[in-house]
Amino acid sequence: MEDIIKPISKELLKAELTEDKRLRMTNKSNNQIYIITHLNAPNVMREIGRLREIAFRAAGGGTGLSMDIDEYDTMEHPYKQLIVWNPEAEEILGGYRYLLGTDVRFDEKGAPILATSHMFHFSDTFIKEYLPQTIELGRSFVTLEYQSTRAGSKGLFALDNLWDGLG
């Protein structure tokens, strides 16, 4: 098992969390929702990978790597990362990885390139009629400091803020 990477500096994170990546404020707790990829915010992506690995290991999972980042996070047309940022504490509360059905790419055999592709057979009918109206969500996490069992009132709205970002 690899050691988890050190936290990314708050200055680097703030420099990448620019207005053009901000979706909006949350409905509760005055946090901010951002959408990033490794292409436009590589340091934020590394911090997401670090926080995911910490959260997943604490729940008995994890990749065993220094951070939880895979090919779906780093491919040419990557999954997007929706995160909740606490501007007061200058830290990420949690996040989701997602891909809209309209953004799905296909391999040379015509199969959709999705994190769940190995789990399902997608029929031609599904791909043509339903996939464009879907969203694949995955790798959701709430940082340990904001999990309600550990954080008390600090974590009260963390999950709500994440769902707020999903709409």
Predicted regions located by residue number:
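A short helix-loop-beta-strand connector motif used in the catalytic cores of GNAT acetyltransferases and
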Residues: 72-83, 106
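Short amphipathic alpha-helix that is part of the acyltransferase structural core
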Residues: 25-70, 81-94
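Short beta->alpha transition motifs characteristic of CBS
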Residues: 96-102
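Conserved N-terminal entry element of GNAT/NAT acetyltransferase domains
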Residues: 2-39
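Intrinsically disordered, low-complexity boundary segments flanking structured domains
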Residues: 16-23, 68-69, 120-128
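Residues that line or immediately flank small-molecule/substrate-binding pockets and catalytic motifs
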Residues: 63, 100, 144
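Short, well-ordered loop/turn elements at secondary-structure boundaries
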Residues: 77-79, 88, 92-93, 130-132, ...
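Acyl-donor binding region in acyl/amide transferases
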Residues: 103-167
